[in-house]
Structures are given as structure tokens and as C-alpha cells.
Amino acid sequence: MADAEASAELPEEARPDGGTLRVLRDMASRLRIHSIRATCSTSSGHPTSCSSSAEIMSVLFFYIMRYKQSDPENPDNDRFVLAKRLSFVDVATGWLGQGLGVACGMAYTGKYFDRASYRVFCLMSDGESSEGSVWEAMAFASYYSLDNLVAIFDVNRLGHSGALPAEHCIDIYQRRCEAFGWNTYVVDGRDVEALCQVFWQASQVKHKPTAVVAKTFKGRGTPSIEDAESWHGKPMPRERADAIIKLIESQIETSRNLDPQLPIEDSPEVNITDVRMTSPPDYRVGDKIATRKACGLALAKLGYANDRVIVLDGDTKYSTFSEIFNKEYPERFIECFMAEQNMVSVALGCASRGRTIAFASTFAAFLTRAFDQIRIGGLSESNINIIGSHCGVSVGEDGASQMALEDIAMFRTIPKCTIFYPTDAVSTEHAVSLAANAKGMCFIRTTRPETMVIYTPQERFEIGQAKVLRHCVSDKVTVIGAGITVYEALAAADELLKQDIFIRVIDLFTIKPLDVTTIISSAKATEGRIITVEDHYPQGGIGEAVCAAVSMDPDIQVHSLAVSGVPQSGKSEELLDMYGISARHIIVAVKCMLLN
């Protein structure tokens, strides 16, 4: 069918008049000028990448998208995610391959939780389609029929270092998108009329996400730079920029502006502040339950307290016990399958604009794969909560590949991230409740084996407050643990007591922030002696965190017990002893400190 015939069959709203088309072209020209000026003024940036997508941006923001300019965080606004190294408000940028996963989370929230009219648009470069996370997101969007999502591939042929593998073979991108179950349009990315039409057509599609594959040219509109290699990420020289700006200005036909369409105001009001459990923990001292199971039970309990609590999992729900939440609230459970990168990105999107309280759970060891997404979540100051189970050598028989021994170090680097490491079921339930109300990212580290409940249901917990479990005026050494190693410290204290050696035992509860006041006061009460014991590698773990906290006090000495080397498979208690973090090793370390 000829383009003219196809255009004639479209309704009037999909066929902007000649005056509107001129304004949209002029808007694209102004966007190019702004990108050139901005990058010249800072001597940094990507003006050629901006230029390739100028018409796309013009059509989206001034003809297609619905939003209130004066209220950019309005819940009814259409969402726009830009992963092309330019700024946007909802998530941090400057990365490649993550934008579509975040957009999936926004679209899923809009379709299934908010049940609202807002739509989600994600602009990507062709270069970032080399990232596997893009295709994780493509599979997710297709599986969940996210027909409120539009992904735009800006196919400008060039990457940072030169031509990309598919260059301008648009049919390759089209076939890939269609193979993933997406409704797909191919369009000339310089043709504002064609762009208006395909974006309108996308709005009519049901049960499928839409991909718009737009053929563009890097540096569009800039003589001798357009479609030229080696200009990626380079501002134009000032003299050349001035000449190019004059050329582009000479092509602008009108000073008229277009106001965006206002959004349809049908998003529900959401209140996710001060979410409280409806009852205290239902455990008795002496009960035995794994903290990973207690976490699953706590999530279900929190879900009852607030209907905006959602849980995502990466095909591990029977091991993380998120299946308990799934059974109670299947409509609020998102199965992300074995795609941890995308799971974290989707969680970021779901939590954006305060629409949900999102918890994402998997084995803590598998989260290393998603560290790039976690890092972006930190830069975005996102309020997502991540649960990592099966931490440390206490995992036991499953072996080293399943044992998270780097996760504390990883999350300690994230700005404003709170790290919970609960010891028993009671403290785990409090960790979940506190995380739901905390600002910034939270990480909850849970343990595989069953452990004994040591706290009463009435015990109160706060972020940054440790628990002193054993203390007396005769204490000689402070032993600091968290999670599984607290039990080893308590066992060591019992054995040393028989030898008239008294130690103070501290359960950190949160590793970040640390309870520095309690640590230092306990150290001073035990003649400056501290032993830390952790089911984690020494690098970046509890020992190093405590050392940093007391580093300004020369009278405090810290000895760290941590896992070293690559662990083997075995029984949990055997491995704790083999790798030097059992009660036996704590006793030896205490006696050595006293001798010195």
C-alpha cells in the first residue's frame, strides 16, 4: 500500500496538518541547537547522538505524549525513559541496556496495578541492543502483554568506536523484535509525519508491546559530521558550532510552539507511607525457622497491611519463600524468571513515582549479575528493596557457586543503601517492615539453614541500632556478629564462661548504617578489644566496616574472622568450622587477644 493511501485511511488525529508538521520539524531543529550549545558550554556530551533522535523527541513530547509540563512527577503523566546518555527525571541515566527494563516496570505498574491510561515510551540506541539485558526486557514485555509500552530503536548505524554489526540493516532489527513477540513498525526517523502515524498506530495495538525501528543518522543536520565516524561523545569546536547553529536556524520556518496534550487523570491515589504490620511477630523464643522463610512470611504479612506491596522473584520463589506471598496475593507477584538484571530494572520501574513498595528476591549470589542495575538504583535514590537469600558458606551442600560471599561488599558501595542482616525470625520480620518505610535502597540478607528464635515478639528494632546480647562488667572482649555468626558467638560465650572468661556479644542487625556508638562504647568497656566474625569474604565485609568505624581511636584493636579462599561443599556446621568462623575459632581468637 502506498504511503499516501495508508495515510488517508488513518483518522484525523493521526494525521497532523501541515502547520503542525512544520512546527514539529522546527522543534527538532531547536533541539539540535540546544544540544550543540549545551555540549559546547560544558565541553562534554553527545550532540551527534542527540541530533539523530531530534525528530523522535519532537513528535513524542509535542504531539504524542500526554503530560503536565508544570508537574513532571504527576502519576497520570505518560512516562519517558531515555537510555541514550541524556538526562531524565525518573531514573538515573548514562548507562546502556537498562532503560527498557525500567520502562517494563513502569508499564507493568500502569497496566496491572494502577490500571490507568498513562503510557510508557523508551528510547534506545541501536548500539545498546548488543546488551543482553535489552532482550531480557523484550521477553518480559511480550510475556506480560505490555501493550502500553513503546520501545523506540534509534538506528543511527554508529556506536562509540565505529559502525555497529547490523549498521543500517533495519530488517534485522525488525525480525528480532518480531521474534520476541512485539508488534513492530519500521519508519524513517527523519519523517515527522510518518512518526506521528506509527506512534498513533501503536496506541491502538492490544495485547502486545510495540517496537518502532527508526532509521536515523548520527549528527543529522550537521554538514560533514552527519553519518561520520569518530564524532561520538565529542562537542563541536566553538567556531564550527556557531556556523552549524546559523545554518540550522536558517531552516526554521516558524516561532510557534505546541503544548502537549494533558493526561487522562485516572490513576488511583496511593499511600505508601508509614506502612505497619497489623500484629507483632508470632514466634516464641526457641522456635527454629530459617530467616529466608521468615522473610517470605513477613512479606505476606506486609502485603495484608498495604495493597501496594509487590514482590518480584527470579524463578527462586520456593527457595526464597516468596511463594508464600504469591499464594496470598498472586495479582501482586511478578515472576521475572532467570533474568536477575531485568528483575532489578523492573523493580526500579515499579517503584518509580512512589507507586509501589517493591521487594525483589533471589539468591544473594545471583545479585552480582545485576550489580549494574543495583548501582543505577542507588544513583536514582530509588526506594526498592532487595532480598538476597542463601548467603555465605552456611548454604552448605549446594557449594561455592550458590554461596553469596561478596554481597555485603557490593551493597556497602551503594549510596544511602541500608543493609539488614537479621539473625532470627523476629528480627527478620522487623527488617522487612523497616525496609518498607525506609528512604533509599534496602538489602535484606537472609540465611538458608534454620536458626533459633532469640528475640521476644515485643523486642523493638531500629535501623542503625545493634543489640547487645551478652554483657557484664567483667567482659574482656567484644565479639561482633550478624546472622548465622551470632549463634557461633553465643556458643563461644557459653563455653568461655565455663572458663571464667567473659565476652560481650553484639548482633549488628544493620551493617549499614553501623551502630558506631554501641561498638565504640563496648570496645572501651572491653579494653579496646574487638573480634568480628562473618559469613562473608573479608574484603568489604563486616570486619572492614567495623575497622573503618573505629579507625580514629588508636586504643581499639580489631581482629576479623571471615571466610577465605574458595569454599567447598559440605554440611553447614562443617563449613563454618572449616573456614574459621565457628565458635571454636572465636574461642581461639579471644584467648589470643587476651594473651597479647
UniProtKB/Swiss-Prot annotation:
Record keywords: Calcium, Cytoplasm, Magnesium, Metal-binding, Thiamine pyrophosphate, Transferase
Organism for this UniProt entry: Macaca fascicularis (Crab-eating macaque)
Names of the cofactor(s): Mg(2+); Ca(2+); Mn(2+); Co(2+)
Residues noted as binding substrate in the record, renumbered to the chain: 46, 232, 292, 319, 390, 398, 448
The reaction(s) this protein catalyses: D-sedoheptulose 7-phosphate + D-glyceraldehyde 3-phosphate = aldehydo-D-ribose 5-phosphate + D-xylulose 5-phosphate
Subcellular location: Cytoplasm
Main EC class the enzyme belongs to: transferase
InterPro entries: THDP-binding, Transketo_C/PFOR_II, Transketolase-like, Transketolase-like_Pyr-bd, Transketolase_BS, Transketolase_C, Transketolase_N
Binding site for thiamine diphosphate: 49, 94-96, 127, 156, 218, 232, 340, 366, 402
Stored Gene3D superfamilies: 3.40.50.920, 3.40.50.970
One Gene Ontology CC term in the entry: cytosol
Name assigned to this protein: Transketolase-like protein 1
Phylogenetic lineage: Eukaryota, Metazoa, Chordata, Craniata, Vertebrata
